[in-house]
Amino acid sequence: MVAEDAPVRATCRVLFRTTTLIFLCTLLALSISILYESLITQKQIMSQAGSTGSNSGLGSITDLLNNILSVANQIIYNSAVALPLQLDTLESTLLTAIKSLQTSDKLEQNCSWSAALINDNRYINGINQFYFSIAEGRNLTLGPLLNMPSFIPTATTPEGCTRIPSFSLTKTHWCYTHNVILNGCQDHVSSNQFVSMGIIEPTSAGFPFFRTLKTLYLSDGVNRKSCSISTVPGGCMMYCFVSTQPERDDYFSAAPPEQRIIIMYYNDTIVERIINPPGVLDVWATLNPGTGSGVYYLGWVLFPIYGGVIKGTSLWNNQANKYFIPQMVAALCSQNQATQVQNAKSSYYSSWFGNRMIQSGILACPLRQDLTNECLVLPFSNDQVLMGAEGRLYMYGDSVYYYQRSNSWWPMTMLYKVTITFTNGQPSAISAQNVPTQQVPRPGTGDCSATNRCPGFCLTGVYADAWLLTNPSSTSTFGSEATFTGSYLNTATQRINPTMYIANNTQIISSQQFGSSGQEAAYGHTTCFRDTGSVMVYCIYIIELSSSLLGQFQIVPFIRQVTLS
């Protein structure tokens, strides 16, 4: 797919939705007109024939309205449910056919063929879904680690450092990026950015292999930081900010650092834009990508964000006195209710970060090349999420979910279902619904360790996202039982003991630690997918591991099967 295809597809979607809305509005207007004429006629009949004919007249009107409503409901169902499902099925069929043609071609001896940017047929229909029922989720175990070549390069000197991975996977392909620091792990001085894209293919042993088809090394003197990546049709989109000062200094600034969007297509087209989203200047002191991956949703690319909001601004005032306390806290915290509320309210404000309000949200950008003022910043309401932090967005079918790093006082994995409201064809508001869980804890310092259960001010933790294996919406009460997998650091206060796990709301079901006790580690990213040929579910756990040989950290992808026992 070439770069120009994306705007055409977006335009077609807009035309279809606009036509549908116009048709529905026309139908509504006709219905009102018919109803009005019917009422006038009925009034005339009643004045001439008395009340004897009223019942039959009302009955005919009721039948007429029922017929109109039935037609309207069928149109709404077809446009909102049936047609998208048919399009999704058609897309999968076309992708499978294209991949089949590409892999079956026998090439002439002197010809070359560039592999199509499409995953193997076995995986196309097994990506970005919930893979198990609620009952099956209770009986899952981790399979052994599988040996595959790493698609992630490491540092090549003892002084080098690779950090902050971001990975995105869709039906067609995957995108990956990380920061490369030449000396030490402080990314605010000078760093480069590694980017790659590729596909999933099966090995002769039957398990998947991540094949790299394109790489890009951004080494141009621009210090891009905390980049989030998302797959888009035909390539990758990456969101970074540019800064050459420590994180704390960013929060004390009067204006946010430079924001950049980079679009890299498989046909070697590269577009980079400095963006200026409306409502950011004079409101946000700093605005940062969430480092976790974004998603492509209804023609828009969504990225997780967080940053510091300036006191007295409209956003600050709108969030005043808002707070969120996860459902599980009531049974686990010994503080009285008033103390919990007071501490929860104050947890969003940091004197260490210049008394800014630490806020989470979503950056939404349309998929087109002229993005200077097109991207939008959508903040979460703080009565639905905790203090702002790094994060990740997921697509499960047609639903968007959000992971928020547990920087604040609640140490458990924070996952939310996100609802996005569109106005005039563009996203205008977001809301979040938390998946209640008292697992899996992250390490933290002081009173904010993995054992803490009560509200208070914290600025700690580590990024450790998780993949939902079951659908939280499948239960009568949202999220009352959910199973997920990921990696965490199995200690109360230190970044050590990386452990891969499967857990539900209340307990860890299966786990396996990597390396010896005391192995240092940091960020962890998890993504799962299904081989529809063997019906096996695989998960890739991307973990930052400390190294005594090459660099302070190496980023390692581990792959293993999740099995139903």
Curated annotation (Swiss-Prot):
Q: What is its EC number?
A: 3.2.1.18
Q: Keyword check for Zinc-finger, yes or no.
A: no
Chief place where the protein resides: virion
One annotated GO molecular function: identical protein binding
- The signal sequence is none
Q: What is known of its domains?
A: The C-terminus (head domain) is involved in binding the cellular receptor.
From the record, what ranges are coiled-coil?
none
- Which family is annotated? Belongs to the paramyxoviruses hemagglutinin-neuraminidase family.
Membrane topology, as annotated, equals:
Single-pass type II membrane protein
Q: How does it assemble?
A: Homotetramer; composed of disulfide-linked homodimers. Interacts with F protein trimer.
Where is this protein localized, as stated in its record?
Virion membrane; Host cell membrane
Positions in the Intravirion compartment: 1-19
What's its catalytic activity? Hydrolysis of alpha-(2->3)-, alpha-(2->6)-, alpha-(2->8)- glycosidic linkages of terminal sialic acid residues in oligosaccharides, glycoproteins, glycolipids, colominic acid and synthetic substrates
Would the keyword rRNA-binding be found if you checked this record's keyword annotation? no
Q: Where is this region: Involved in neuraminidase activity?
A: 223-228
Which biological process annotations from GO are given for this protein?
symbiont entry into host cell; viral budding from plasma membrane; virion attachment to host cell
**Keywords, ordered alphabetically:** Disulfide bond, Glycoprotein, Hemagglutinin, Host cell membrane, Host membrane, Host-virus interaction, Hydrolase, Membrane, Signal-anchor, Transmembrane, Transmembrane helix, Viral attachment to host cell, Viral envelope protein, Virion, Virus entry into host cell
Lineage, top-rank taxon, reads: Viruses
Disulfide bond entries: 161-185, 175-236, 227-240, 333-454, 365-375, 448-458, 528-539
Name of the protein this chain belongs to: Hemagglutinin-neuraminidase
* Glycan-bearing residues: 139, 267, 504
Pfam families annotated for this entry?
Answer: HN
- Entry's transmembrane regions: 20-40
Q: Which gene encodes it?
A: HN
Q: Which InterPro entries match?
A: Hemagglutn-neuramid, Hemagglutn/HN, Sialidase_sf
An example of a Gene Ontology cellular component annotation for this protein is:
viral envelope
Function, as annotated, reads: Attaches the virus to sialic acid-containing cell receptors and thereby initiating infection. Binding of HN protein to the receptor induces a conformational change that allows the F protein to trigger virion/cell membranes fusion. Neuraminidase activity ensures the efficient spread of the virus by dissociating the mature virions from the neuraminic acid containing glycoproteins.
